[in-house]
């Protein structure tokens, strides 16, 4: 699963889930990245610089993946090898999603993993208050501050 998170308000702005990380090669990861970049444009932030931070996995360091950034104002950032603590926000979000699979959501009630993840993302962005956001949801927080 690929997740793109806006660390300003902890909103998941792009994601993709597949049966296998390598099942469709770079296509899996490009789709999630394109969702995030298109979301950036829809929100009116095309001209603002964006930092995309990833680990050093083979997909994220590939030429094909990095070519996507050429037409966007994106700065690449990568964790040091074997150092997940360089990206604690996304590591925490991944951990939360895995816990939610068993606690708040019954994965057995879903026909597909994609639908399950769609619901988790919707819940995160629209219904899950965060201490860091003064107990507001990601959408409420950015809206109250006047952002799209």
Each model region followed by its residue ranges:
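Active-site beta-loop-alpha junctions of metal-dependent nucleic acid enzymes
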Residues: 16-44
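Acidic/histidine-rich, metal-coordinating catalytic segments
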Residues: 45-60, 84, 137-139
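Surface/interface recognition patches
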Residues: 19, 31, 44-46, 61-77
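Hydrophobic "anchor" residues
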Residues: 9-15
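C-terminal domain-tail junction helix/linker
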Residues: 66, 70-74, 96-148
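RNase H-like polynucleotidyl transferase catalytic core
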Residues: 52-56, 70-89, 105-110
């Amino acid at each position: 699963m690929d997740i793109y998170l806006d660390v300003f308000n902890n909103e998941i702005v792009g994601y993709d889930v597949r049966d296998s990380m390598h099942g469709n090669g770079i296509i899996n990861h490009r789709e999630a990245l394109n969702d995030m970049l298109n979301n950036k444009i829809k929100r009116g932030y095309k001209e603002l610089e964006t930092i995309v931070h990833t680990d050093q996995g083979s997909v994220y360091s590939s030429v094909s993946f990095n070519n996507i950034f050429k037409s966007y104002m994106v700065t690449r950032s990568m964790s040091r090898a074997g150092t997940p603590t360089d990206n604690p926000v996304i590591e925490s979000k991944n951990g939360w999603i895995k816990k939610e699979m068993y606690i708040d959501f019954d994965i057995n009630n879903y026909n597909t993993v994609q639908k399950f993840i769609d619901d988790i993302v919707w819940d995160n962005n629209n219904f899950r208050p965060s201490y860091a956001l003064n107990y507001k949801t990601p959408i409420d927080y950015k809206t109250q501050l006047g952002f799209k």
